[in-house]
């Protein structure tokens, strides 16, 4: 409250708390009201924003609170969590939109530290595509698991610079001891990759470098295939020759019965690893397949937020289109854990929960931003949803499995898919 009073942007008018001992009391000059009074308080105090200051609440309780606010003409935002405040990662006046996990309605599963450590602790780890959405989050989590050295590999100078700077701040702030190396390069340069593996004696590779925007790859087929297919082939072959212990491909649900070039390129990348795994290689190859990640550069969430900020409309391809979703930290955490389970050629599939209709996600985001979607609402308080049609190669619904055979792994969120594969010599012939 004191932080809000120091600025001009916010004018606090009332507290709302479900603690009956606090209700009807006055704190710092503000009345403490009951949650059920909020609908009446909004017009009474001309409230335009509600700030959630419940950092210790359970995910279930947070969702209950957010659901109760969805229908009100207010913008719902949040303050940082206790853990972020204690770690110095945020300050109390850093108010932001609600967490993506709250939009999703998923409860994060506590990680199994022993799995994360198996491929990382005291090892030299390399991440390709280190500056991307998934790659950068893998790096953030890897540095906290005590690697001997982390090699960042990316073809984008700015992305590489940004993640290196961020990681050095994390390392310094947490007093971590590890070497950090940032290397510019392309996964399409096989000699460069093998040289890097050998020079730094890389033990574990997380291959996150890929073009993932479906429409972009659809219109840039040659580059998409060169990067996603041949880049994976070169990276994996170089790992095999250099004696890398573990090579993990970050894959996608779009690789299952693909209807677009991006999905087909990722399925070919999977087939390369499945084939290589049968070559008596010293390298343990595996792949982790999951759906969309909220907040990534290819996600609808940043697009929807920008469209809402601009006053709409919010564009959705089809009323029935649905996708599996997961937050970036959760996806990265599960990739690190799955990589420790592979024996060779494993296809791991993450439990993505129930698919989410994109139009429902759009409606929730619009309402939590304080706008209405009803046609009879005033134009100044309404954001329209516009259906623009499925894009070339786009499915209504995605799948995570090629067949129906899957087995558990001992981790509630990670399954092993039992799928057919082509012998490596046949894969090579197709690629050549």
Where are the model-predicted features located?
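A solvent-exposed beta-alpha-beta segment
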Residues: 1-87, 155-164, 181, 185
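Flexible, Lys/Arg-rich cytosolic regulatory linkers and terminal tails that connect or flank
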Residues: 23, 30, 35-36, 62-124, ...
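Proline-aspartate-enriched helix->loop->beta-strand connector
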Residues: 42, 46-49, 147-148, 197-206, ...
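NAD(P)-cofactor binding segment of oxidoreductase domains
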Residues: 63-79, 149-156, 198-199, 219-246
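Conserved Rossmann-fold NAD(P)-dependent oxidoreductase catalytic core, especially the SDR/UDP-sugar
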Residues: 88, 207, 211-270, 275
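N-terminal Rossmann/SDR dinucleotide-binding element
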Residues: 93-101, 105-201
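Strand-loop microenvironment adjacent to phosphate/nucleotide-handling motifs in alpha/beta enzyme folds
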Residues: 110, 117-119, 241, 275-293, ...
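Hydrophobic/aromatic anchor residues within beta-strands of the central parallel beta-sheet
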Residues: 182, 224, 285-288
């Amino acid at each position: 409250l004191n932080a809000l009073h120091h600025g001009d942007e916010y004018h606090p008018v009332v507290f709302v708390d479900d603690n009956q001992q606090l209700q009807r009391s006055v704190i710092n000059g503000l009345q403490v009201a009951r949650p059920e009074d909020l609908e009446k308080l909004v017009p009474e105090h001309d409230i335009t924003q509600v700030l959630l200051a419940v950092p210790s609440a359970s995910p279930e309780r947070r969702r209950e609170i957010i659901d109760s606010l969805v229908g009100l003409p207010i913008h719902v935002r949040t303050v940082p969590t206790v853990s972020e405040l204690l770690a110095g990662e945020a300050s109390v006046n850093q108010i932001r939109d609600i967490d993506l996990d709250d939009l999703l309605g998923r409860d994060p599963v506590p990680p199994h530290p022993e799995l994360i450590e198996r491929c990382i602790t005291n090892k030299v780890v390399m991440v390709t595509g280190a500056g991307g959405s998934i790659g950068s989050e893998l790096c953030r989590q890897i540095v906290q698991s005590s690697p001997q050295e982390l090699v960042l590999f990316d073809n984008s100078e700015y992305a590489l610079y940004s993640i290196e700077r961020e990681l050095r701040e994390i390392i310094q702030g947490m007093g971590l001891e590890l070497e950090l190396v940032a290397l510019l390069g392309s996964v399409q340069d096989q000699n460069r990759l093998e040289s890097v593996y050998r020079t730094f004696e890389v033990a574990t590779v997380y291959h996150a470098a890929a073009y993932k925007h479906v429409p972009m790859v659809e219109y840039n087929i040659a580059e998409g295939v060169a990067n996603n297919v041949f880049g994976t082939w070169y990276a994996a072959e170089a790992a095999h020759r250099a004696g890398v212990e573990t090579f993990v491909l970050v894959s996608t649900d779009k690789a299952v019965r693909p209807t677009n070039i991006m999905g087909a390129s990722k399925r070919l990348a999977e087939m390369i690893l499945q084939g290589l795994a049968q070559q008596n290689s010293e390298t343990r190859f595996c792949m982790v397949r999951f759906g969309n990640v909220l907040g990534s550069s290819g996600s609808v969430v940043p697009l929807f937020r920008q469209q809402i900020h601009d006053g709409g409309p919010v564009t959705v391809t089809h009323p029935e289109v649905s996708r599996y979703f997961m937050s970036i930290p959760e996806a990265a955490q599960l990739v690190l854990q799955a990589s420790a389970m592979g024996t060779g050629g494993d296809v791991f599939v993450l439990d993505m929960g129930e698919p989410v209709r994109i139009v429902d996600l759009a409606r929730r985001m619009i309402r939590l931003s304080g706008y209405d979607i009803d046609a009879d609402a005033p134009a100044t308080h309404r954001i329209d949803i516009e259906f623009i049609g499925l894009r070339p190669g786009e499915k209504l619904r995605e799948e995570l499995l090629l067949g129906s055979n899957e087995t558990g792994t001992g981790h509630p969120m990670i399954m092993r898919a039992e799928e057919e594969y082509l012998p490596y010599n046949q894969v090579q012939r197709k690629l050549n």
